[in-house]
From Swiss-Prot:
Protein's GO biological process: coenzyme A biosynthetic process
Similarity comment text for this entry: Belongs to the type III pantothenate kinase family.
Organism, scientific name: Ruegeria sp. (strain TM1040) (Silicibacter sp.)
Keywords: ATP-binding, Coenzyme A biosynthesis, Cytoplasm, Kinase, Metal-binding, Nucleotide-binding, Potassium, Transferase
Chain's gene name: coaX
Pathway: Cofactor biosynthesis; coenzyme A biosynthesis; CoA from (R)-pantothenate: step 1/5
Binding site for K(+): 129
Cellular component aspect of the GO annotation: cytoplasm
Note on cofactor: A monovalent cation. Ammonium or potassium.
Name of this protein: Type III pantothenate kinase
Reaction(s) catalysed by this chain's protein: (R)-pantothenate + ATP = (R)-4'-phosphopantothenate + ADP + H(+)
Compartment annotation: Cytoplasm
Binding annotation for substrate: 107-110, 184
Matching NCBIfam families: baf, PRK13318.1-2, PRK13318.1-6, PRK13321.1
Length: 260
């Protein structure tokens, strides 16, 4: 079985794969101080509660937080007796090319989404990921990652309003019934929601115009379902795109005889 780990700035997600079937999926907050022992106790407890008897033989990690990787490596070595693949490291091969400026470092989550998006939808694709940042990743016809856009995340924008303006409260994002708000919370929700709808539409339109070819647009990430309600923005929504990509990258490395 394969344990896939996606460590983001806010949350870390673990998924257990048996072949091409995901049989478990768990989320925790990202904390670099968390030890390998703590990860194992937490994970094994949740597996036991769900009656999952895991025989983990492989592990793959994607992390946008470098400080977390060390203890995840220890988890893999100590408890599963396997050396993990880490996306972005030289020992982890990708099944797609990366065509960006020399010396540029691309976030591993963006590469993983590219792999998964291309496998399912083919090329000429835009992947919009609503995470701590809102990212737009462009996949060429042959599956290559050719760049993208990074914008502030939705919740980050709401928090910035709250912290920078003393009179504005903390609010949760939701789709407002009307554009014109009749109270402060509704005004903030409208500004952020419809502002991001406009941001996504404009950036995707400009990417398509610059690319000069028809492109599919798919969404993923924690807040993607909220914006999926705006039907004309996306062609599809994928709730576990990153985990699908990690499974595919692991499979690719096995196929070429690369066992980290």
């Amino acid at each position: 079985m394969l344990l896939a780990v996606d460590c983001g700035n806010t949350n870390t997600v673990f998924a257990l794969w048996d072949g091409d079937q995901m049989i478990g999926h768990w989320r925790t907050s990202t904390e670099w101080q968390r030890t390998a022992d703590q990860y194992y106790v937490w994970l094994s407890t949740l597996m036991n509660l769900q009656g999952i008897k895991a025989q983990i033989t492989d592990m793959i990690i994607s992390s946008t937080v470098p400080r977390v990787v060390f203890n995840l490596r220890v988890l893999s070595d100590r408890y599963f007796n396997t050396r993990p693949l880490v996306v972005g490291k030289p020992e982890c091969a990708l099944p797609v090319d990366v065509r960006v400026d020399e010396g540029t470092t691309v976030g591993p989550d963006r590469l993983v989404n590219t792999v998964a998006g291309y496998e399912k939808y083919g090329g000429d694709l835009i992947v919009v990921d609503f995470g701590t940042a809102t990212t737009f990743d462009v996949v060429a016809a042959d599956g290559a990652y050719v760049g993208g856009v990074i914008a502030p995340g939705v919740n980050l924008s709401l928090e910035a309003l709250h912290h920078a303006a003393a009179a504005l409260p903390h609010v949760d994002i939701s789709k407002p019934q009307n554009v014109i708000g009749t109270n402060t919370v509704a005004c903030m929700q409208s500004g952020v929601f419809w502002g991001y709808v406009g941001l996504v539409r404009e950036i995707c339109d400009r990417i398509k115009a610059e690319s000069g070819v028809p492109m599919k647009v798919i969404s993923t990430g924690g807040l993607a379902p909220l914006f999926q309600q705006t039907a004309d923005l996306f062609d599809a929504y994928e709730d576990d795109l990153t985990m699908q990509g990690l499974r595919r990258i692991h499979e690719h490395n096995k196929d070429i005889g690369n066992h980290a």
